[in-house]
Amino acid sequence: MAFATLDPTGLLAPSAGALSAEGPALEVVPPGEIITDLAAATARFQTSFDALAAAHEPGLAPPAGTIDIAVQVWREGYHMPPSGNPASQIAWWILDAGSAPERPEAGAIIIADPRSGPPVPSALARLWGRHLMIGPRPGSHIAVPGWLTASVQPVEAGQYVLVAIASTAR
């Protein structure tokens, strides 16, 4: 996994400041309506994907194809069950978030290792089947191999999360 705190200041269009907790649970927004410099955003994702590939060499090659960026707004009621991604690498970047939720896990991204591990519990068994929670704080960023599962904890009333999701084409 590659972690970073990436300041989105200067990349967000004024329309990002007009977002609120009111609206559909999941809103897909064209990236160019929220991100003013898509080339700069792509470069930031590319840096994370390169770092991820370097940490996993030789099993995970750096992306040679395109990096696709999607922008979503998550609001009350949105959640995503654990699922994998067909991309070789995927990354999330929290661009903005509304008020802090009552439950710290509300709107959090959960990254999990879907492997169950060895049948005999041991210290080595803890290497498999673990998970990591990334809270919905502006600037939070993580890149992971696409085979890891990701989920989103249910978003609370009065909360919204603006997120850019990048994936590499296989």
Labelled PLM ranges:
Residues M1, S88-I90, H141-A143, V161-V163:
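Intrinsic-disorder/low-complexity, polar/charged segments enriched in Ser/Thr/Lys/Arg/Asp/Glu/Gln
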Residues P63-G65, N85-A87, G158-Y160:
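Residue-level preference for beta-strand/loop junctions
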Residues I90-W93, G158-R170:
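A short hydrophobic beta-strand segment most commonly corresponding to one strand
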